Amino acid sequence: MGFIDLIEITAAIIALLIAIIGHEIMHGWVAYKYGDMTAKNSGRLSINPLIHIDPFGSILVPLMTYFIPMLMGADSGFLFGWAKPVPIHTNTVIRNGGYNAAMQVSLAGIVYNLFLATFSSVILLSMSQPTEADSIVYVFGYIFILKLLLINVILAVFNLLPIPGFDGAHFISYFTLKYKIYAVAEFFTKAEPYGMIVIIIILVTPLKIPLVMWPIQTVLNLLVG
């Protein structure tokens, strides 16, 4: 493993933590604005990464999808993971703000990721690609911004998919409940224990290309051309 690989891994870890931890904090923060104190009282609105780390989603999944393939010399362009879900008392949110509030909570993390992706793209477009003459600080900064852009786009796209247990499914559930269509929410609730299986199937089969890779490339084209 070369020095540039070490820089890339460090930048990727920091960018991933910023993306996944901020994603969860935003869910809790919006819920807090609608009177749900659960996340705040449990200390989950803190930026301390240790309280947000999920052993599977924050460590094992990134290792499987990015770091191990990279160390083996394979393509390392797909980094995915998640933080420990922030506890939210949805009934409190709905009682205080209705289903619109619940939908806002569902989308809060995605909005955060899209904001960071847009912000990163603006910075990236103002930078020139590093050369051997550039300092280590500049090289690290460029790689970090690039990773921050890629990771946040990946997270936004994945969470928009209607996968049981993920934000897209939660949004659809609350949207249909608002119009008293109960069957959809019941389906997603019953299917939630199988959401992880769906994720694994998407990651290890050709389904990843139309469901994830194409949307990711579309968003990246819109942001940086």
Regions found by a protein language model. Give the residues of each.
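Hydrophobic transmembrane alpha-helices and their immediate loop junctions
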Residues: 1-225
